[in-house]
Amino acid sequence: MGEQLCPEPVTDGTLVKWNMNTGNRYRLAWRLTPGRRFTTTDLMTFRFVELIGLPFELTPAMLRGVTVRRASCGEGSHMDCDSPLLCDLWRLTRNTVELTTQDLYVDSQSRERGAYEGDALINQLAAYSFESDCATARFSLEYLYAHRTWPAEYILWITEAAYEDYMATGDDSSLVRWYPILRGKTFSAFTDADTGLLHSGNAGGAGTDAVLVDWPPSERDGYDMSVRYNTVLNCAAVAGYEALARIAAVVGETGDSGEFAARAAALREAILTRLYDPATGDFSDGLYQDGSRSAHISQHTAAYALYAGVYRDSAMADRIAGRLWERSLRPDAGGSRIRMSVYGTYFLLMGLYRTGHGSMANSLLLDGDSRPGQRTFSYMLRRSVGDFPSPFDGLPVGATLTTEAWNSVNKPNMTFSHPWGAAAAVAIVRGVFGVMPTSPGFETFSVHPQTESMTGEPILSGELCLPTVRGIIQVSVSRGNCSVRFVGASVPPAKSTSSE
């Protein structure tokens, strides 16, 4: 059993790659005794099964598959549009959420099977794109509140995930219960009085509170990891403080709310003063211990700044996004347009959508370049499992679930069942169709589609059905001449707003 087929039979004659990239060896040897039955149970993540050495001819009628699985997450959810690639991405991410979710959000069932905060944030928001049942998300988050993992940014992202849970459910009981722990998920103790910036307390680059930036390390776009005050970490801290300010307000801790909001504002200003170059529109990777600025500029710095709202006004956000486009995102910039992992790409895409630059985000999301080695979702769909026919869900070749990395060159032990690659689901709902809750439990929501593309054809028409705790939001978009002509929303029985 395995996730891939071998290009040609290996020495033992097998076609299924049972000695997997992940280090698992999915090969079972059974000695069959005439007249006797046996049963076996294991949890394995595989796509192909090969039976070898049977003492009789095997026919399809002899095989029966039995599965134990959660209820389908797709009930009530629907998306269709005039972009075949976007429709394929919708199915790919829906299948990923449905088939990788058991009782806890984990990075992948085919390797660690561990829960991680950064993975859970993307998994959670992707799941909200298809289902209104938020129980698995809440259980996973509450597990992580008490069982943190090592990356420094992850303890900051978990507060954002906590607030997203409240906005999706309208239920504040989890925030009330866990607030004493959530309020401590900061690096305030490591704020430098001279610069106003913070660090994680771990200068060694490994172990608890080491700064991740991105994973695997080959996907960091050459990030200068020797800096003491890391731009990505500081941007994540701004987002974390703002999430805590909102959470504190919900649970009635108004003093804490004001303090966290003030910290977010002060840190934002410190980043812009110390790490941003107004002459170029670029962010440095960070400051060294002596206060000097790193000369290196990675794609991550601008992406995380846009995501976390690290800019003074919309004009500055436009400048940052425009510079990001010119430096690396435009097709003729040289090299890969996306210079981040499938995990980091979530922050890149959503940073662009959040600042109204959906035309740039869509150009990346719908990049049809599926040549070997490209960092595109098209490559993930059509190339990442090899050039073998796939019977799954109508996709001709490629991945059937989102992958851990863009390709195995960047991460040789990559899995082919990694929900942190499902950023496209969030991009479709919150970016392309622009549906966002504006009050807890979707009592009110906004609709602000972004269907343009800086390259290629825009999305001319589409429709989305989004399940929520209050019912299904139905949105249809019809465009012409680069403007949204109509947005129709069938609203569940609660107050709502719709804006073009």
Question: Residue locations for each model-derived region?
Answer:
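Extracellular/oxidizing-compartment recognition motifs
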Residues: M1-D103, D107, D119, D133-L141, ...
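Hydrophobic alpha-helical scaffolding
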Residues: T39, M79-S83, R113, A126-F130, ...
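Well-ordered alpha-helical scaffold segments within catalytic/enzyme domains
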Residues: L54, I122-E131, I158-S174, A236-T254, ...
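Catalytic-domain carbohydrate-binding cleft regions of carbohydrate-active enzymes
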Residues: Q102-L125, S129-L144, D172-S173, W178, ...
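Non-catalytic C-terminal accessory modules of carbohydrate-active enzymes
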Residues: E269, S359-E500
